[in-house]
């Protein structure tokens, strides 16, 4: 869950273990502050790209493609990781699970990204590596889904066509 889930998923798992009369973690400012602190301390500065991401992203941008980032992490964490990799300027908007659009696999964040560029879902595609990414792409009705995976057998869902898999 920690690798494929969002902070919201982790919080929900912890909440289920707590006494029912305890303040929900989503409403607990102390918990929220501690999670922000831990994210800054442990996550920031530890971005590890899946191969050379800068070259293809720069090529897409130079060719006129508009690129957005949709993550189940926080916007702050995503922006910091992109900045660390030197590619933050390629993404607009950067949408996180904390942006008010819900998390993947819900389609709302992806639909917001598409609308931010004045496009329709059928004119967009999503590149991702998780079931949540694939689910968001399907729910939003984008034209296609490109999967980044170690191999065709490692794609997040069997409905992802093998020809849509780009090896890491």
List the model feature ranges, each with a label.
Residues 4-8, 40-69, 75, 79, ...:
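Short, acidic loop-to-helix structural element flanking the phosphoryl-transfer center
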Residues 125-165:
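Acidic, Mg2+-coordinating phosphoryl-transfer loop and its flanking beta/alpha structural elements
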Residues 77-80, 112, 136:
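Phosphate- and divalent-cation-binding pockets in alpha/beta enzyme and binding domains
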Residues 88-92, 120:
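Conserved H-loop
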Residues 104-134:
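Conserved Lys-Pro-Asp/Glu-containing loop-to-beta segment of HAD-superfamily phosphomonoesterases
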Residues 54-62, 114-115, 134-139:
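Surface-exposed amphipathic alpha-helices with a cationic face
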Residues 93-103:
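Glycine/Thr-rich beta-alpha phosphate-binding loop at enzyme active sites
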Residues 1-40, 51-54, 59:
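A metal-dependent, Asp-based hydrolase signature
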């Amino acid at each position: 869950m920690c690798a494929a889930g969002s902070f919201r998923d982790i919080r929900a798992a912890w909440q289920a273990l707590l006494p029912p009369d305890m303040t929900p973690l989503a409403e607990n400012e102390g918990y929220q502050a501690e999670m922000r602190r831990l994210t800054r301390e442990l996550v920031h500065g530890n971005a590890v790209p899946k191969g050379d991401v800068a070259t293809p992203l720069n090529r897409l941008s130079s060719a006129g493609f508009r690129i957005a980032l949709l993550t189940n992490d926080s916007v702050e964490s995503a922006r910091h990781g992109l900045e660390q990799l030197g590619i933050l300027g390629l993404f607009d908007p950067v949408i996180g699970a904390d942006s008010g659009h819900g998390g993947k696999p819900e389609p709302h964040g992806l639909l917001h990204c598409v609308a931010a560029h004045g496009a329709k879902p059928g004119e967009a595609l999503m590149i991702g590596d998780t079931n949540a990414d694939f689910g968001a792409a399907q729910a939003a009705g984008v034209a296609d889904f490109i999967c980044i995976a170690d191999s065709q057998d490692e794609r997040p869902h069997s409905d992802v066509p093998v020809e849509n898999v780009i090896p890491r």
